[in-house]
């Protein structure tokens, strides 16, 4: 949601989810853009827990450098470089690499406090060290909104993707599958299915122009994407129409072309044209200024496989057999009346959700149509189970969505099936029992791991149900809205 007067090359990317995990970064570093592409990474859901950050960063920068120069070496390197001695070229390249490592995205508030954020200092967001006690927009809504699309580098063109066309949907799936978020060690990459993308990108009120693609003019190949979806957001005592920004992705070979900043700038312009001037997004990196910070936790369902693919490791003094026994679950759920959600449950699920979310400070506000879209079960996308008591009343529900990851370069295992905790509402069944049953159901459905953020009331069950803490944070951000920050337990919003 960048200011219209800024130049395109300075624009950073909102978060994805923005898919962002430490969605591992995989993007080229852009020091003058303040890591504009890194915002869209690091969700925290991919990374194996408890690895050291320093090792990851060096490894990642090395890999980036190896694959960096594909398309632009002739255009971007000064001609005089060829006349320098090989030793001198190596010295320069090493200095550039060391500089890049030192200037990588900040993963903690401490790291961020040592950075300058020249771009973000021009944007309608609070400064990192600012103490905010007020509520409201940082700047007023705009009247003069640019009517023409922003200019892409030569040879590229905009295309609003028609995801109702299976061929186009497959193109988007392929772009994300081959270029989207990886963990820091390049071991796992999110694998969004075409059906999941339709669920995530076409909720009630979706607009085709907000499925913003970039194609090569000559070949029509899809090489970039960013999306926005509408969302009514309740922030403290205010309800505001916003967008959620997601799925920023640029083809690996084009990351030196500065396509990502223009993508972000263009989606901002298109959102402004619809009269919306606030956005919510998440990122695994620290930018000015998080409204909340959450941490991913992981519960092993298939510990042998997770250890074999190095998602997790055997603890000291633990054998594989003891580990499998530690994480063993009951064969069936124990809550009486637990069953899959049906169409007839939509009104009561809507009512339960709306009441439950009132205790939190950052939440979605959904109507019945949106509840149907986000919660009605779809195989391999979203699972929702309700608890019906002896009187036929639905009193509780649990939900989790499906997001597998491709396992890179493993001889046996090709995919990691992960369940992500969505919204879980309890009025009669203890939350601990509800979530214990969620683990059992996920195990029965063949999931390898169950992931949950420490938001809402989740901290009350994570350790008791043998979740292990992940190695990265997920920051929540609001664009053009100022309010006090909140603890994770007051965040009541889950983005895909």
UniProtKB/Swiss-Prot annotation:
The keyword Glycoprotein does not apply. GO terms for cellular component: cytoplasm; cytosol; plasma membrane. Its main location: cytoplasm. It catalyses: N-terminal glycyl-[protein] + tetradecanoyl-CoA = N-tetradecanoylglycyl-[protein] + CoA + H(+); N-terminal glycyl-L-lysyl-[protein] + tetradecanoyl-CoA = N-terminal glycyl-(N(6)-tetradecanoyl)-L-lysyl-[protein] + CoA + H(+). One of its GO terms (molecular function) is peptidyl-lysine N6-myristoyltransferase activity. Its EC number is 2.3.1.97. Keywords: Acyltransferase, Cytoplasm, Membrane, Phosphoprotein, Transferase. Transmembrane segments: none annotated. It comes from the Eukaryota. Residues 55-66 have a biased composition (Basic residues). It is found in: Cytoplasm; Cytoplasm, Cytosol; Membrane. The modification Phosphoserine is found at residues 31, 47, 83. GO terms for biological process: in utero embryonic development; ketone metabolic process; N-terminal peptidyl-glycine N-myristoylation; protein localization to membrane. Pfam families: NMT, NMT_C. Residues 1-81 are annotated as: Disordered. It is an enzyme of class 2 (transferase). Tetradecanoyl-CoA binds at residues 118-120, 247-250, 256, 258-260. Adds a myristoyl group to the N-terminal glycine residue of certain cellular and viral proteins. Also able to mediate N-terminal lysine myristoylation of proteins: catalyzes myristoylation of ARF6 on both 'Gly-2' and 'Lys-3'. Lysine myristoylation is required to maintain ARF6 on membranes during the GTPase cycle. This is Glycylpeptide N-tetradecanoyltransferase 1. It comes from Rattus norvegicus. The gene is Nmt1.
């Amino acid at each position: 949601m960048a200011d219209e007067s800024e130049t395109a090359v300075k624009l950073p990317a909102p978060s994805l989810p923005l898919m962002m995990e430490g969605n591992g970064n995989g993007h080229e570093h852009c020091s003058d853009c303040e890591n504009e592409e890194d915002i869209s990474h690091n969700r925290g859901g991919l990374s194996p827990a408890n690895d050291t950050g320093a090792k990851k960063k060096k490894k990642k920068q090395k890999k980036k450098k190896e694959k960096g120069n594909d398309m632009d070496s002739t255009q971007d390197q000064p001609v005089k470089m060829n006349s320098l001695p090989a030793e001198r070229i190596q010295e320069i390249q090493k200095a550039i690499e060391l500089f890049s490592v030192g200037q990588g995205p900040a993963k903690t508030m401490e790291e961020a406090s040592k950075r300058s954020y020249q771009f973000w200092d021009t944007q309608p967001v609070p400064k990192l060290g600012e103490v905010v006690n007020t509520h409201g927009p940082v700047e007023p809504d705009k009247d003069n909104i640019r009517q023409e699309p922003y200019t892409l580098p030569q040879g590229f063109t905009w295309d609003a993707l028609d995801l109702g066309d299976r061929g186009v949907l497959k193109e988007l799936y392929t772009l994300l599958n081959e270029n989207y978020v990886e963990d820091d060690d390049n071991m796992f990459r999110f694998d969004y299915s075409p059906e999941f993308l339709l669920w995530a990108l076409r909720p009630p009120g979706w607009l085709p122009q907000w499925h913003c693609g970039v194609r090569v003019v000559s070949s029509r190949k899809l090489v970039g994407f960013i999306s926005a979806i509408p969302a009514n957001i309740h922030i403290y005592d205010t309800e505001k129409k916003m967008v959620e920004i997601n799925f920023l992705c640029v083809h690996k070979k084009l990351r030196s072309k500065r396509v990502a900043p223009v993508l972000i700038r263009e989606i901002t312009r298109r959102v402004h044209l619809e009269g919306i001037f606030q956005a919510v997004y998440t990122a695994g990196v620290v930018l000015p200024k998080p409204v909340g910070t959450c941490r991913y936790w992981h519960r092993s369902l298939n510990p042998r496989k997770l250890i074999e693919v190095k998602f997790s490791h055997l603890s000291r003094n633990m054998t594989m057999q003891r580990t499998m026994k530690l994480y063993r679950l009951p064969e069936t759920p124990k809550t009486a009346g637990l069953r899959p959600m049906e169409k007839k449950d939509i009104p009561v699920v809507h009512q339960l959700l709306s009441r439950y979310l009132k205790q939190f400070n950052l939440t979605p506000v959904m109507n019945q149509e949106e509840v149907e879209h986000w919660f009605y079960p779809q195989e391999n996308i979203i699972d929702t189970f309700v608890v019906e008591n002896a009187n036929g009343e639905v009193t509780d529900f649990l939900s989790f969505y499906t997001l597998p990851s491709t396992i890179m370069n493993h001889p046996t295992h090709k995919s990691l099936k992960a369940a992500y905790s969505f919204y879980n509402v309890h009025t009669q069944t203890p939350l601990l029992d509800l979530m214990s049953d969620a683990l059992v159901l996920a195990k029965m459905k063949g999931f390898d791991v169950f992931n949950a953020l420490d938001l809402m009331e989740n901290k009350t069950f994570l350790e008791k149900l043998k979740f292990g803490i992940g190695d990265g944070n997920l920051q929540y951000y609001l664009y053009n809205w100022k309010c006090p920050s909140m603890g994770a337990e007051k965040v009541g919003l889950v983005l895909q």
